[in-house]
Amino acid sequence: MHLQFLGTGAGTPSRERNVTSIALDLHGVRNATWLFDCGEGTQHQILRTPIKPGRIEKIFITHLHGDHLFGLPGLLTSRSMNGCVEPMTLYGPAGIKTFVETSLSLSGSWLTFPLEIIEISAGEVFQDAHFRVTAYPLTHPVECYGYRIDELDKPGALDAQKLAAHGVPAGPHFYQLKQGRSVTLDDGRVINGWDYVGSKIKGRSLAIFGDTSPTAAASELAAGVDIMVHEATLEVAMEEKANGRGHSSTVQAARVAQQSGAKKLIITHLSSRYLHHDCERLLAECRAVFPHTEMAHDFALFPC
C-alpha cells in the first residue's frame, strides 16, 4: 500500500500546491484506491498520476469546507461520463448527501454507477475482511472528523516443515490449516491448524486528520499508528492565529505524533503564504519536536 498526496495546500490553491486530497492505494491487498477529501481540481491532479477513477471504491470526506469538497461533483460526473459502472461508497458528515444530490440535480447530471452515501458520526464507519475505518471528532468551526485505518492482523506463516515431520502431506487442506481450522486426514487423525501457524502478522495502521486545532481525540485517533497525516497550516509563531481558525501549527502537529506514539508524521495542508523556500523552516520546526517527520508535496508518494 502507499499514500499519494494529490493536494497539500490549505484554503485556496497556489502555484505550488492544490487543495486537499489524499489517495490510499490498496495495492497488495486489492486493486482499489480510497480517496480522503476531494478539493477543487482533484480530478485534474489524478490525470497526472496512475490512479484510475474507476478503481476509486471509497471516498472519505473529513468535513464540508470547500477546499476539501468542491472537487467531488466533477470527479463523480467524470467517472460516470467515462462509462464506469463500478459501485462507489461515499462517507462524510451530515449534509454530504444533500450536497451531492443538489449538485447533480441542479447541473442536470446523473451517474452510471451505484453511489452509496453514508453520513457518519464518531465511531466505526466501515469494516471488511481486511480493514477497519473509524471516525474521530475533531475541533473545527464545522463538523469535522479524522479517519483511522487499521489493517486487520493476518494469519502467521504455515510451518510446512513441521507438518511434514508429523506426516501431514501437502494438499488443499493446507489453506484450511493456515486459517487455524481443524482438518481430518485420510488416516483419521485430526490436525489443529493453530498448532502449525506462526504468530499473527500485525496489520498496518494510519491516521488521517481533517482540519483541527488541538483536540482530545487526537491521542486515540493516532495511538501507535505507522503513519500519521496531520495538518500544519501555520508556523509556530502564528499558532494563536491557527488555533483561532480551527487549525494547528507545525509544532502542535509534531506534539500529537510524539504523544500518541506514531512512528511517522507527514504534515500537509500548508497555508498558501508559504512558498517552496519556506518549507525547510516549517519542517525543521516539526523535527525539533518529532524527528520522524516528512512534509508532503503534491504527488508525493509514501509507502505504508
From Swiss-Prot:
Function: Zinc phosphodiesterase, which has both exoribonuclease and endoribonuclease activities.
Alphabetized CDD domains for the sequence: RNaseZ_ZiPD-like_MBL-fold (cd07717)
GO function terms (MF aspect): 3'-tRNA processing endoribonuclease activity; exonuclease activity; zinc ion binding
Cofactor note: Binds 2 Zn(2+) ions.
UniProt superkingdom: Bacteria
One Pfam family in the UniProt entry: Lactamase_B_2
Gene: rbn
PANTHER family (UniProt xref): ZINC PHOSPHODIESTERASE ELAC PROTEIN 1
UniProt organism field: Erwinia tasmaniensis (strain DSM 17950 / CFBP 7177 / CIP 109463 / NCPPB 4357 / Et1/99)
Protein name: Ribonuclease BN
Annotated positions binding Zn(2+) 1: H63, H65, H140, D211
Quaternary assembly: Homodimer.
Enzyme Commission number: 3.1.-.-
Family: Belongs to the RNase Z family. RNase BN subfamily.
Keywords: Endonuclease, Exonuclease, Hydrolase, Metal-binding, Nuclease, tRNA processing, Zinc
Active site: D67
Residues that coordinate or bind Zn(2+) 2: D67, H68, D211, H269
Cofactor(s) needed by this chain: Zn(2+)
Disulfide bonds: none
